[in-house]
A protein has these predicted regions:
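Predominantly a Rossmann-like dinucleotide-binding segment in NAD(P)-dependent oxidoreductases
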Residues: 11-16, 21-175
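Conserved strand-to-helix beginnings and helix N-cap segments that scaffold or border functional pockets
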Residues: 1, 27-28, 214
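Long, low-complexity, intrinsically disordered N-terminal extensions of eukaryotic proteins, enriched
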Residues: 5-6, 21, 32, 244, ...
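Rossmann-fold NAD(P)-binding glycine/threonine-rich loop
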Residues: 1-14
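Generic structural signal for beta-strand residues in well-ordered domains
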Residues: 8, 38, 58, 92, ...
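NAD(P)-dinucleotide binding in Rossmann-like oxidoreductases
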Residues: 103, 109-253
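Extended hydrophobic/Leu-rich segments
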Residues: 8, 34, 90, 237-238, ...
């Protein structure tokens, strides 16, 4: 980061961190809803990011982002900085006062490896039943090829199947997910208390069956609930005269 800053200063350029989720129809419309004032002030925000197991294993268990030592950032900064930005941006009438966070490596660690599991999948007696077997996961499914095969040093369309098989016998992409040198957490929770008394929580879970970002905002006179993947949310407004609530689906598709 310092190198980038120094080069920008040298060239007279600006370096801007762009948190692009602010500009999606989903979050920008929610922001307008909150700023409109009908729901009153924010009382509580709950944000969840579930990282699909294919993405998580390729990038954060076997991929280069598995190592804070190599990449200079933990999982929260590498994967979830968008969500911490959203929390503060949606509630930008105030500022964070207190922050607490905890997490650990819970799933992808050696204690969870089946008995007799080997360092590399090609030697492992559990290959047939293991959902993370490198040959099924990387070779057959080939979820994110432009990450996996980069170490071979050839254009993707020139790499043969035989070269890929040999590569998996010696590279981290061929290692047991429970035995890599991953040094980051695989799930983390963040709690924030804001200066105006509102609170926010963020849960990031790595290795989920389905990817998704979910948000639930509770305001004085209503709520907003939705998944960005659906590109729609529920606007729940408290009806003061009837002492009940009314739901309206805001579909942005």
């Amino acid at each position: 980061l310092f190198d980038i800053r120094n080069k920008a200063n040298e060239k007279g350029c600006k370096v801007v961190v762009c948190h692009v989720l602010r500009y999606t129809p989903f979050y920008s419309t929610i922001k307008k809803e909150i700023d409109g004032g009908k729901l009153g002030k924010i009382m509580s925000m709950q944000l969840n990011e579930h990282v699909w197991y294919g993405h998580f294993v390729n990038s954060y268990v076997r991929g280069k982002w598995r190592s804070e030592k190599e990449c200079g950032s933990g999982l929260l900064l590498a994967k979830c900085c968008h969500d911490t930005d959203l929390m503060c941006w949606l509630n930008n009438v105030t500022t964070p006062k207190k922050v607490s966070s905890f997490g650990s490596k819970s799933l992808f660690c050696e204690k969870n490896a089946p008995e007799g599991a080997t360092q590399y999948c090609y030697q492992c007696p559990h290959r047939k039943d293991c959902p993370f077997d490198a040959y099924k996961f990387e070779l057959e499914k080939d979820f994110i090829p432009f990450y996996t095969w980069l170490g071979i040093g050839k254009p993707l369309d020139e790499i043969t199947r035989e070269e890929k098989i040999e590569f998996l016998k010696k590279d981290v992409y061929g290692q047991c997910v429970y035995k890599t040198d991953m040094d980051i957490v695989d799930r983390q929770c963040v709690s924030v208390e804001f200066a105006n008394g509102s609170i926010g929580t963020l849960n990031m879970i790595g290795g989920a069956s389905k990817a998704g970002r979910h948000i639930h905002i509770v305001c004085e006179f209503g709520e907003i609930v939705g998944y960005i993947e659906d590109n729609k949310y529920i606007l729940r407004v408290f009806d003061k005269s009837e002492l009940c609530y009314k739901d309206k689906t805001i579909d942005l598709n």
